[in-house]
């Protein structure tokens, strides 16, 4: 049985509706740090194995959780567990900084960026471009039904970045005004497909039809080493509106052929050539 403090972190991860793969991976690493603080070393190995399973179960569509679980060794030493969890967090922050620097190079003065959902990685790219004195505008979808786009809008407003919020249904219309699309990712599959908030596929199709370059921002810890697109389990959380059940699949899968490139901390990779 995992300690109550660890279980509470897992519950917090499961409750979260807005923040994405990076936030969940960070909370997962914090769960392992808490485990190191709470348990006697004689109980540690079994608890680590249990927590590795539970972390992945929080959201099987997020490769960051799978890779975190793989990164943490089964050990009876608290110092090793703590060291590995901290190292994962350090690598996460370093990767985001490097990726943001690379991604900001894609943004030119006068650009109109279109995005979907909330990605802390995409936000970091946009902020970095702003710090480099580039002038641009962001079009963002409200991203229903959880409205992650409104969270992004607040962050952009705080950073003094011009933006416009649209309904999801208008992404095909407004992408014509964009010069570049950048979205985040919850997983890049082994065969180069992009798993992200439902609606990402539609935006990619609209951009393809209108010759708008479509980029995905994903640190390498969001790349799944074994899972292919046909094996992805997409979570579903149905809604009830006026006594009517509405299907609500949380994620979709975008084929690599619609992706101009994947921005990583190691550079821009072209799927599936650079992933296989």
UniProtKB/Swiss-Prot annotation:
Q: Alphabetically list the UniProt keywords.
A: Initiation factor, Protein biosynthesis
The answer, when asked if Transferase is one of the entry's keywords, is no
Matching InterPro entries: eIF2B_alpha/beta/delta (IPR051501), IF-2B-related (IPR000649), IF_2B-like_C (IPR042529), M1Pi_N (IPR027363), NagB/RpiA_transferase-like (IPR037171)
Cysteines joined through disulfide linkages: none
Q: In the record, what terms sit under GO molecular function? A: guanyl-nucleotide exchange factor activity; translation initiation factor activity
User: Could you describe the subunit structure of this protein?
Assistant: Complex of two different subunits.
So what does this one do? Answer: Catalyzes the exchange of initiation factor 2-bound GDP for GTP.
Q: Which family does it belong to?
A: Belongs to the eIF-2B alpha/beta/delta subunits family.
Task: State the protein's name.
Answer: Putative translation initiation factor eIF-2B subunit 2-like
Protein species of origin = Pyrococcus horikoshii (strain ATCC 700860 / DSM 12428 / JCM 9974 / NBRC 100139 / OT-3)
